[in-house]
Swiss-Prot record:
It comes from the Bacteria. GO terms for molecular function: ATP binding; ligase activity, forming carbon-nitrogen bonds; zinc ion binding. Pfam families: QueC. Homodimer. It catalyses: 7-carboxy-7-deazaguanine + NH4(+) + ATP = 7-cyano-7-deazaguanine + ADP + phosphate + H2O + H(+). Zn(2+) binds at C191, C200, C203, C206. The gene is queC. This is 7-cyano-7-deazaguanine synthase.
Amino acid sequence: MTNQNLNKDKAIVVFSGGQDSTTCLFYAKKHFKDVELVTFNYGQRHDAEIEVATRIAKEQNLKHHILDMSLLSQLTPNALTQHDMDIETGEDGIPNTFVPARNLLFLSFAGALAYQRNAKHIITGVCETDFSGYPDCRDSFIKSMNVTLSLSMDKDFVIHTPLMWLDKAQTWELSDELGVLDYIRHNTLTCYNGVIGDGCGECPACQLRQRGLQHYLEAKGAN
């Protein structure tokens, strides 16, 4: 397998403007000389996500690619793209915010972009510890996707998942170690209802984020 055209110092970050992907952004800036961002517009529940991602990219002076993935909303009804659908968890334990094949498609397009931009590294904020029932956030899926992308383009890509084995408290700890905890707390969008920063406090994403922050700050204060 040839990788002679890939820049080992260049990374593409799958970026939504949320806590996890913004932590990955700063992780990438620490570990790679050349960082670019890719955001997918798939008709997500809150349009503000694209605006937040664009603003953060500009503030960090990073090249930002926005790709149209609106076809995702046509595949299956889900609470991330259907604004009138209440967020619920099914009998199988998978919440209706799950978008089938989302990460499969996102990583495929991120890989195609990395190929065009000569980037060896792809960074995504998926996490198995707090994977919320999403099967495409599992480590086994990411490893298989890494092999598939490399074989499909005859390039030796490396998919990085710095948050894979971290819970939310540990993700906050990582952002603190990177010196950006306050920035991420006040400028990112995790809330399913589109409230920037600490969010609405009611949706599952906000509750998970706030619980993790509280646990981290309590542990930090005890040390």
